[in-house]
Structures are given as structure tokens and as C-alpha cells.
Amino acid sequence: MGDVLVTLKILPKDTDADIKSIEDQVKRNIEGLCSINRMDEVDIGFGLKYIKLEIIVQDKEGEIDRVENSISSIEGVGEISTENVSLI
């Protein structure tokens, strides 16, 4: 099986959330589950930000769900959505 490039959008639970802290926790939580291709803070407007995360996972059933579940367990994370999935 090949690998898949997945783009995730991680929204904080509230506007006061510490984005840098969430980024650090994401890195720790997903270590060993996937590799990080890119992680950026994106401004929505009016001080609101989200994390755009590109990861590479194995093309196996349930891999993306495992990563999403690991991220959603982080305090301060509100919503996670998968924006793009590409076979590489």
C-alpha cells in the first residue's frame, strides 16, 4: 500500500485558546501515527485562527480516524475537519 497526504483543519474550542500550545500538543500526540508534512497557523479574521495540518499516513483503513481521535483528545481543540486527501 502507498501513502496518503491528508490536510486537516483544526479549530480551537474558543478564541482565547493558545494556538502554539495546541500545535505542540498535536506534534506530541500524533508522533508515531503519521509524519507531519506541514503545519501552519491561518488567520480567519478578527483575531481568530486555526491550524492547517498536512500529514502523511499509510493508505490503510482507519489511519486518518486514529490521527483525528488523537488530536481531538487535546484540551483546547474544538473541531477537526478533513479538507483534502491525496494518494502520493
Swiss-Prot record:
Cysteine-cysteine disulfides: none
Domain of life (superkingdom): Archaea
GO molecular function: translation elongation factor activity
CDD domains on file: EF1B (cd00292)
Family annotation (InterPro entries): eEF-1beta-like_sf (IPR036219), EF1B_bsu/dsu_GNE (IPR014038), Transl_elong_EF1B/ribsomal_bS6 (IPR014717), Transl_elong_EF1B_B_arc (IPR004542)
The keyword Protein biosynthesis belongs to this UniProt entry's keyword annotation: yes
Entry keyword set: Elongation factor, Protein biosynthesis
Function: Promotes the exchange of GDP for GTP in EF-1-alpha/GDP, thus allowing the regeneration of EF-1-alpha/GTP that could then be used to form the ternary complex EF-1-alpha/GTP/AAtRNA.
Membership in a protein family: Belongs to the EF-1-beta/EF-1-delta family.
Protein name: Elongation factor 1-beta
Gene: ef1b
